[in-house]
Curated annotation (Swiss-Prot):
Gene encoding the protein: hgbA
Organism: Haemophilus influenzae
UniProt-recorded Gene Ontology molecular function terms: siderophore uptake transmembrane transporter activity
Name of this protein: Hemoglobin-binding protein A
NCBIfam families: TonB-hemlactrns
Sequence repeat ranges per the UniProt record: 26-29, 30-33, 34-37, 38-41, 42-45, 46-49, 50-53, 54-57
Length: 1013
């Protein structure tokens, strides 16, 4: 009978490895009698929650176990033989190191059914799981919810389409993570609001992970990746002295943009939507994790922690197009968009842990956290003088200032074309020679356009740049007639010196207006720069109380976890904009000069407030701060209860319940809070009186009334979440798991209140939105054996109710300006609504077999297979774009028994995205009968080979070759990030030019070296 079990398992795995219609679930490294829905921010009875000076009952492999990172539903760790838990994946730190994960995208590289949302220049923005993405997939770090995007689809389409906001979910530094837990399907027990499609929960490392058998640990790792030329350095220090222990993990990363396929073959000078080469960015990331703990006794532990993370990206959006502002869209670009984006997260926390067993708890943990997250998008638009001709700094003659004197480009005296002179050309014997000052004799003897100024304005020489003590160095011409270039050199130049605004200047004092002109380039001498800086701030203070208790009732074992949480979050937007100058040249005006005041009968110094002209260099402008959204304060209270009930060795249940109370409070103080543009709130709720549309006083009053009205609209939501999981083991090799869970997401303030008016794209507010609800049903069958491995097949279905989505509402007329002048204009309108229903269903397979049982020479080898197929529809038959195409991952791995070396070979196959499974929300607006998305991903297969070697005890070398066959492909997440309108992430929709920018890298390599002591 035993042999039959082994044969049945082996045959089942072999079938899964070859089946194209297989169904995958995710494995886990958790013991089977542990709760599957355990809140990740809660303490458990694991050794990592024990004081470092306490003995443990773990075996000799505990050190290795504690350095593992768990991702619910996965068993990438090559030595893991534990069968998977339903709908969860567990990935270890050892696995992330083995796979050389550098970012969140690498974490799920070999997972099926989980992908990362692409956000163009801003990188990644959260995850996509089971048909939903971004804010509908919860992300926590050490129990703290991470920054959410402004989830109103109208806001995203409107502003992200133009690259104005860094509206993304922040990432995490891989090197600081101890555990990553990915749950598929609705489950708000762990994360509260937002866990509709699933959750991704990170836990950071702790000194106790390294100090089990010694009092210190030192590690240094250096790595490099060719896909983006990223190099990184990580230093890890852990130590214990008496009752104190400390951990420091610091990481720095430096690289550039991800190199798309054919990166080196494309023209890097092309600007606009037809650009095929990835936009250039310099990307840096710094992270520091610091934890200091004090254990006064063996049952008490205090910890002060700081988790500091900063991601910076500087470069140019060369694919960005400004042509929407041009009359002739085919004109070449002049200005280019320079970016300086930042994501910054600071979390300071203090925790107290108690391990004294009482009637109410076995472990108790109280944590206070203060987290600040800032996502910033900074853009500067100006002409790139180093790349193209720029009118503002044009100097065609190459005039140069040398030792206070104006010369030719090589420092030699100026020479101009002579006109009808009888003397020797350029001879000094006749100072009255006539020249054409528009023609300069270049250093090679050829005539070129001088491009000198013929301005009527008085030029003030800055004496700190020009030699005001030697007027002869001021090259000045005297025209024969007014406003022409033919003339003579002006002799005996006299200068009038004046101190203007604390600096000494000089001007020509003996010239003739209209005839006398300085030899200077005619351009402004600087580049005008329009800049915008837009911040999204999320500041959270949170208090957690988490307890665990193990007990028995009769013969039934209970592993009880319960607790509560209270937090306040302030989310606000701050926009800054201005106008100034960059690349200032030596001939640029350094003063506005003077003008004669006839009332005062005297000459006065010009200022930015009094001048009639405009000078971006001397009079830069900074606009008042403004915002498109009211700041919102959110108060959240929650209590939870979770019990893992073990009835017998063959039957156990996981029961979870959570109650959430969410209160939104708009906060606005007139004159203090960044102002909302009038057009956004005018007549939003309170209409203007008839005929007052052009009355400025009435409009201002109406704006304030509408803001006050919004600020008083507090919103409250209550939610009850639950989860039920049953695990049945009828035999030693067969397991049946059933899951039913509920999750929710409360509408965000921007989804309810955001409005925007434009004839092409108008967003209407909707204050009647209901919370989104998700209910997941899942069943999993698992064949497993301690020596052979496992195969797990699951079927799932998630029903979404009141799914919030942006829909086209048709045309609507708005009164604009004076009705007698412009009348009414039709606006294309969109609005967030609660859809009646949405459903996602699918099948997953997850299997792993260890080959050592088949033959001795195959000891250490393993085969794995994962497969996910899912399909989803909204409102009956509208496809859900976040659903991934059918995906399967084959794996072959090997680990030497002594762990001296090993490798993994992965084959990933992704099917094409079918047109009937996509939906263009702008199809109606474009009067299209075909509602599918035009640009989709085709099927592809990629091969990766990664390995490690440990030549000596303290040294580990890892290397990998990715996309081994150099396959050209585009992922569905990249393809769906292409926008049909806007100026960012756009291509030529007619020809497809520019789409190569979105393709994944070709063959690339990674390598790292790590020393440990």
């Amino acid at each position: 009978m035993t042999n039959f079990k082994f044969s049945l398992l082996a045959c089942s795995i072999a079938f899964a490895l070859n089946a194209s219609t297989a169904y995958a679930a995710q494995p886990t490294n958790q013991p089977t009698n542990q709760p599957t829905n355990q809140p990740t921010n809660q303490p458990t009875n694991q050794p990592t929650n024990q004081p470092t000076n306490q003995p443990t009952n773990q075996d000799s492999n505990l050190s290795e176990q504690l350095e593992q990172i768990n991702v619910s539903g996965s068993t990438e760790n090559s030595d893991s033989k534990t069968p998977p838990k339903i709908a969860e994946t567990v990935k270890t730190a050892k696995t992330l190191e083995r796979e050389q994960a550098n970012n969140i995208k690498d974490i799920v590289k070999y997972e099926t059914g989980v992908t990362v949302v692409e956000a163009g220049r801003f990188g990644q923005s959260g995850f996509a799981i089971r048909g939903v993405d971004e804010n509908r997939v919860a992300i926590n770090i050490d129990g703290l919810r991470q920054a959410e995007t402004l989830s109103s689809q109208g806001f995203k389409e409107l502003f992200e389409g133009y690259g104005n906001f860094n509206n993304t979910r922040n990432g995490a530094e891989i090197e600081t993570l101890k555990e990553v837990n990915i749950t598929k399907g609705a489950n708000s027990i762990k994360s509260g609001s937002g866990s509709l499609g699933g959750s991704v929960i990170y836990k950071t490392k702790d000194a106790r992970d390294y100090l089990l058998n010694k009092d210190y640990y030192v590690s240094y790792k250096k790595g490099y990746a060719t896909e983006n030329n990223q190099s990184f350095n990580t230093l890890t220090l852990a130590g214990r002295y008496k009752k104190f222990d400390v951990l420091v993990v610091t990481t720095s990363r430096n690289g550039h943009e991800l190199e798309n396929y054919g990166y080196k073959n494309y023209n890097d000078k092309i600007q606009g939507k037809r650009r095929e080469k990835a936009d250039p960015y310099k990307i840096e990331q710094d992270s520091t994790l610091l934890k200091l703990s004090f254990n006064p006794t063996e049952n008490h532990r205090f910890t002060l922690a700081a988790d500091l993370y900063e991601h910076r990206s500087r470069g140019q959006d060369l694919s960005y197009t400004l042509k929407y502002l041009k009359t002739l869209p085919d004109l070449p670009e002049v200005d280019s968009r320079h970016t300086n984006d930042k994501t910054k997260r600071h979390n300071i926390s203090f925790s107290y842990e108690n391990f004294s067993q009482t009637p109410f708890w076995d472990t108790l943990k109280i944590t206070f956290s203060k987290q600040k997250i800032k996502t910033r998008a900074r853009t500067d638009e100006y002409c790139d003088a180093g790349v193209r001709y720029c009118e503002g700094t044009a100097n065609p003659a190459g005039l140069k200032l040398k030792n206070g004197e104006i010369t030719r480009r090589d420092g030699t005296p100026l020479q101009f074309k002579e006109i009808n002179n009888t003397t020797t050309p350029n001879s000094n014997s006749n100072k009255d020679k006539t020249y054409d000052f528009s023609k300069l004799i270049d250093t090679n003897g050829k005539e070129i356009e001088s491009g000198i100024t013929r301005s009527n304005d008085t030029f003030w020489y800055d004496c700190s740049i020009f030699d005001c003590e030697n007027p002869g160095k001021m090259k000045v011409a005297e025209g024969k007639t007014y406003y022409r270039y033919d003339g003579t050199w002006k002799n005996n130049v006299q200068l009038e010196k004046k101190v203007l605004n604390g600096k000494e200047f000089a001007r020509i004092n003996n010239g003739t207006r209209g005839k006398t002109f300085p030899i200077l380039p005619s351009s402004l001498g600087y580049l005008e720069r329009l800049w915008q800086e837009r911040d999204l701030d999320t500041n959270t203070q949170q208090l957690n109380l988490d307890l665990t208790k193990d007990f028995k009732t009769w013969r039934v074992e209970h592993n009880l976890q319960y607790g509560s949480s209270y937090n306040t979050t302030m989310k606000r937007m701050v926009n800054r904009a201005g106008y100034d100058a960059t690349d200032v040249q030596w001939w640029a005006k350094r003063t506005l000069g003077t003008r004669f005041d006839f009332l005062k009968n005297e000459e006065i110094v010009e200022t930015c407030a009094t001048t009639f002209g405009w000078n971006a260099f001397l009079c830069p402008r900074v606009d008042p701060e403004f915002s498109y959204l009211l700041p919102i304060k959110t108060k959240e209270k929650s209590v939870y209860l979770f019990d893992n009930v073990v009835i017998t060795d063959y039957l156990s249940f996981d029961l979870g319940y959570r109650y959430d109370n969410i209160h939104y409070q708009p906060k606005y103080k007139h004159g203090v809070t960044p102002k909302l543009p009038d057009d956004i709130v005018k007549e939003l709720f309170i209409p203007l009186k008839s005929g007052q549309n052009n009355n400025d006083a009435e409009v201002k009053k109406n704006v304030q009334e509408n803001i006050d009205y919004i600020a008083k609209q507090n919103k409250k939501y209550k939610a009850h979440s639950y989860s039920f999981v049953s695990t049945i083991d009828p035999t030693s090799f067969l397991r049946l798991q059933l899951k039913y869970s509920k999750g929710f997401r409360a509408p965000t303030s921007d989804e309810m209140y955001f409005t925007f008016k434009h004839p092409d794209f108008t967003i209407l507010p909707n204050t009647h939105l209901k919370p989104e609800i998700a209910k997941t049903k899942e069943i999993a069958f698992t064949l497993h054996h301690d020596d052979w491995g496992f195969i797990s097949t699951s079927l799932f279905k998630t029903n979404y109710r009141d799914f919030i989505d942006l829909v086209y509402k048709g045309e609507r007329e708005f009164e604009v300006g004076n009705p007698n002048n412009r009348g009414k204009i039709s606006f294309d309108t969109f609005q967030n609504i609660n859809r009646d229903s949405a459903v996602v269903k699918g099948i997953e397979i997850n299997s792993k077999v260890f080959l050592g049982k088949m033959a001795k020479f195959m000891d250490g080898f393993n085969l794995s297979y994962k497969y996910t197929y899912q399909k989803g529809r909204m409102d009956g038959n509208i496809p859900m774009n976040a659903i991934q195409p059918k995906t399967m991952v084959y794996g072959l791995g090997y680990d030497h028994p002594s762990q001296k070396f090993g490798f993994n070979f992965y084959t990933t196959h992704v099917a094409s995205k079918n047109p009937e499974d996509t939906y263009d929300i702008y199809a109606k607006d474009k009067n299209q009968t075909n509602t599918s998305i035009k640009w989709r991903s085709k099927s592809y297969t990629i091969l990766d080979l990664i390995g490690y070697v440990q030549p000596i005890k303290n040294l580990t070398i890892r290397a990998g070759v990715y996309n081994l066959t150099n396959r050209k492909y585009i992922t569905w997440d990249s393809a769906r990030s292409i926008r049909s309108f806007g100026t960012s992430n756009v291509i030529d929709q007619k020809t497809g030019q520019g789409i190569n920018r979105f393709y994944a890298p070709g063959r690339n390599y990674k390598m790292s070296v790590q020393f440990e002591f």
